[in-house]
Amino acid sequence: VLHNVKPNRPKYMQGQEMVIKAIFDKNNSKLLGAQIIGYEGVDKRIDVLATAITFGANAEDLFHLDLAYAPPFSTTKDPVIYTGMIGHNITRGRKIITPEEVIKQNNDLLILDVRSPKQFEVNHVDGAINVPLKMLRSYAKTLDKNQKIVTYCNKGTTGNAAQNVLINLGFKQVFNLSGGNKNYQRYKRFQVERKKKN
């Protein structure tokens, strides 16, 4: 299961975020299911994903889709393609971790926020240390290569880059936070609202 937070079109065209949750078979990366929360354009993306499921597509197939692009309707790389890219990374051994797992295991994790200090000040994952991506290589020299590490950014892309940096430096247990800080903050708000109702 993975989460992808991407806009339906570019920001300069008043793009609005959508959250795609996709389920892949971990043995063959076949797409098994998907859900999308968002505004305009979610119907297009869920139709593409439903068709992909019907034809037995896997993560790599999504990654290589050639979908129509025009700024009023989509980003250069469609959110469906990013979903395939994330799924493809996972099948190649890149591990993800959910917000729920981060909260449960918080004391056992080294959580690295690779965003800017300004973004970190606005909000961040509880217990995180701010190490901007450009400083990660030098900071990594101070870390235990066997420690369980979580990297994250706003939505997952830079967190994945940080994960790759650490893996290439020989770190053994590096996880990228699924959906990044946006997904984590949404999950926390949902838990607070749920407790209020109970």
Model segments located where?
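Anionic group-transfer/hydrolysis microenvironments
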Residues: 23, 115-117
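Glycine-rich phosphate/pyrophosphate-binding beta-alpha loops
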Residues: 6-10, 35-43, 70-72
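Rhodanese-like catalytic fold shared by cysteine-dependent sulfurtransferases
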Residues: 60-110, 117-150, 154-198
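Structured beta-strand/loop patches that form or line metal/cofactor-binding pockets in enzymes
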Residues: 1-27
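Short, conserved beta-strand edge motifs with alternating hydrophobic and charged residues
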Residues: 1-2, 111-114
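Hydrophobic "anchor" residues
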Residues: 30-31
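A short, polar/charged loop-to-alpha-helix boundary motif
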Residues: 40-59
